[in-house]
């Protein structure tokens, strides 16, 4: 296969590179000592101090990403809600009324109409009725249990 423009084989002549005569007496660019020594390289003292980045060429940037150390995101300020405040106020009032309620005292009834002579008279106090325990068994049940335990002491 031919890789050139014409399909004819081409020949190139390689010439040996000839060193160009150097006019600068200092060290050549990119060359170090021909023999390795532990001596430090001489620094060029006559380097122009213009722009150091321009003389070095393109420098590779660091790949380290600089994030801030710790950033706490603050939540937005919650707007006051009047309906929520009113709800908490009403719940507080109901809770206080439940705590301060006295047991066994009936709640006073508000007058239905305007005050008249009958309402000014003292009303008789109704007797406080004790609540009945409808789930309690008659006392003969307790006697039956005691007689059962006397007859069968090893049952329990």
UniProtKB/Swiss-Prot annotation:
GO BP term, pick one: negative regulation of apoptotic process
Biased composition (Low complexity): 44-55
Glycoprotein keyword on record: yes
A GO-annotated cellular component: membrane
Residue spans, topological domain Cytoplasmic: 1-82
Residue ranges, compositional bias (Polar residues): 7-17
Compartment(s) where it occurs, according to its Swiss-Prot or TrEMBL record: Membrane
Transmembrane segments: 83-99
Region (Disordered): 1-65
Residue positions with a glycan: 133
Coiled coil: none
Similarity remark: Belongs to the IER3 family.
Subunit structure: Interacts with the PPP2R5C-PP2A holoenzyme and ERK kinases; regulates ERK dephosphorylation.
Name this protein carries in UniProt: Radiation-inducible immediate-early gene IEX-1
Organism, as annotated: Pan troglodytes (Chimpanzee)
Designated gene of the protein: IER3
């Amino acid at each position: 296969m031919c890789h050139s423009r014409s399909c004819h084989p081409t020949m190139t002549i390689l010439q040996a590179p000839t060193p160009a005569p150097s006019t600068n007496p200092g060290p050549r660019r990119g060359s170090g000592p021909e023999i390795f020594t532990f001596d430090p390289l001489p620094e060029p003292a006559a380097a122009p101090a213009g722009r150091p980045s321009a003389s070095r060429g393109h420098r590779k940037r660091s790949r380290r990403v600089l994030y801030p150390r710790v950033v706490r995101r603050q939540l937005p300020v919650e707007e006051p809600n009047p309906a929520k405040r009113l709800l908490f106020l009403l719940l507080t009032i109901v809770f206080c009324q439940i705590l301060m309620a006295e047991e066994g005292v009936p709640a006073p009834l508000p007058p239905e109409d305007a005050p008249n002579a009958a309402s000014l008279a003292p009303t008789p106090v109704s007797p406080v009725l004790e609540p009945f325990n409808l789930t309690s068994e008659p006392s003969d049940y307790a006697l039956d249990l005691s007689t059962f335990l006397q007859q069968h002491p090893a049952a329990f």
